[in-house]
Amino acid sequence: MRHIKLRGTYYDIGLDNGRLLVSEKIKGFPPKFSEQNLERSKAYEEEVQTYCPGLLDELRGMAEGCEVDYQALVAFELTPFRLKPSCLVFAIVAEHTKSGKALFVRNHEWMEEEAQYLANCTVHPSGKLASYGFTFLWPLLSRYGGINEAGLAISGATASFENSGPGVMLNIATRWILDNFKTTDQAVEFIMEIPKVWGINYLIIDKKGTIAKVEAHRQKTLVTYPAKGFDFVSITYESPEMQKLVPNETPQRLQMFETRKQFLSNWFQEKKGTITEQSIIDIMKVCDNQLHYHEKTPEGTFGTCWSWIVSPTSKQALISLGPPCKNEFKPYEIDYKFS
């Protein structure tokens, strides 16, 4: 796992990160895109300029730092012409845990072999919030979840890979939220405003313990604030009105979603008030409950490539570098004031 710690203006962060990426050029960085996709990426660039403007300065710094084409980085980071991970995320408020601290949990579902490419990034852009976020492969702008110094934690799960047109992708929206917002309501407001690309389920919790589930789609976005102090998102929409927007969902994905929902609901009802990080780890390690899976293909094994647990009131992350059934969760310090 790579640990990246950078601060400064967005451009300076990009420049320093770009210099770190020079050695990756012999490994195929940046990936090649067709002229058509490079041209199409400009529409996504315009949307990010509108809603997350500083991040483009970071990309420009990266392009200069590693001497690669800026538009190739735009196509790689801002568009849907890329990897398609699914995920599982759940959150529990403080009153239902034994320690009295809220917990936020994520399984990143992609190729298990990609676990070696996990990167955690502690960044502090000038005038913004410091954050601790997770990405992989080549660590550029993207964050697939994380937590910031205000105690706001966010992640998400893709509900539909249908490309509905230029907008702000999950990985970019998550980064911008970590950089800028302190409360769940602020993050929700931002997600409501942005044009969506894929269908995404976001889950958010802040330091006050406010959980929001945001089922987001270009045609409609539905926000739920669970009264029970627990919620989860996974590989499809939960609400019937949002499911109508994904009419071609496979029976296998629907069944997995329902299995996960039923298991987590029963587990929460049984354990609430006594939940600990270890009790979460215990269920994450079990294959039969379908919180993770192993699907062997010619390309590799699809499943969980890493898992992590954070708390809005803690400066520690527990991370499993690989499928949790085969790997231990180890503690890592979250240091927002790094030198």
Task: Describe the residue ranges of each PLM region.
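C-terminus-biased signal that marks the final domain/tail of proteins
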Residues: 1-87, 182-193, 207-211, 233-339
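A contiguous strand-loop segment
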Residues: 13, 28, 32-33, 50-171, ...
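Fold-independent oxyanion-binding glycine-rich loops
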Residues: 106-108, 137, 157-158, 207, ...
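Asparagine-centered polar/low-complexity signal
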Residues: 107, 148, 201, 232-240
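Short, surface-exposed beta-strand-loop junctions and turns on beta-sheet-rich folds
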Residues: 110-112, 160-162, 218-221, 323-327
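Structured soluble/peripheral alpha/beta segments that form catalytic or ligand/cofactor-binding pockets
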Residues: 138-144, 150, 161, 184-193, ...
